[in-house]
Amino acid sequence: MKTINVSEETYEKIKNQLGEEEKVDINELKDFVGKKLFIRTVTYHLVGKVKKFTGNLLELSDASWVADSGRFMNAIKEGTLDEVEPIGTAWINMQSIVDIIPWKHDLPTEQK
């Protein structure tokens, strides 16, 4: 049997990619508070951390507009985005949301 040595950083990255899907129990909107999400609306995409809900608005902190996600599987699994612009705080009309996907990566801090 052959053995391959990898750095701790590489091991953690592989372990995270091969690990079980995180179970997210969402029963009401407030369960999203504190979660990092990739949100697709009818016209654009954002990533950010849910801060609160006000009426029909979802407030994101550390939000970024995703102009081009690149290959979608890579964006979700690896956190790689082809074109992204950090914008800070953002409010989203929840009626415009098409889908929401957990974001397991650091939120973008640099324009790309």
Cite the ranges covered by each PLM segment.
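Conserved RNA-binding domains used in RNP assembly and mRNA/RNA metabolism
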Residues: T3-K112
